[in-house]
């Protein structure tokens, strides 16, 4: 996948399904290392939204800014990313 926003990545994580159900790895340090992504988990949240729900932008100014790992566990989601780093060549770009 190619994105307009500099630094935006998609990780393909392990997924296996058989007659018993399925098994998915939701975090794998090696996946981040292969993409040369310095990522350290500080917090983890799970949210369940009803159909048609629109959630707000997530942004923190330094020194509180941090990377985001977004996963859709069931159903589907449209996750929109907006480049707000004014020093980035992709400033103002949008990807989803």
Q: What residue spans do the PLM features occupy?
A:
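Non-catalytic, conserved peripheral segments adjacent to functional cores
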Residues: 1-96
């Amino acid at each position: 996948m190619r994105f307009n926003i500099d630094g935006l990545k998609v990780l393909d994580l392990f997924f296996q399904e058989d007659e018993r159900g399925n098994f998915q790895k939701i975090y794998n340090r090696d996946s981040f290392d292969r993409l040369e992504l310095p990522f350290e988990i500080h917090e983890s949240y799970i949210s369940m939204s009803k159909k048609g729900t629109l959630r707000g932008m997530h942004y923190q100014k330094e020194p509180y800014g941090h990377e985001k790992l977004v996963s859709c566990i069931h159903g589907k989601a449209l996750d929109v990313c907006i480049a707000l780093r004014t020093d980035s060549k992709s400033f103002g770009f949008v990807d989803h």
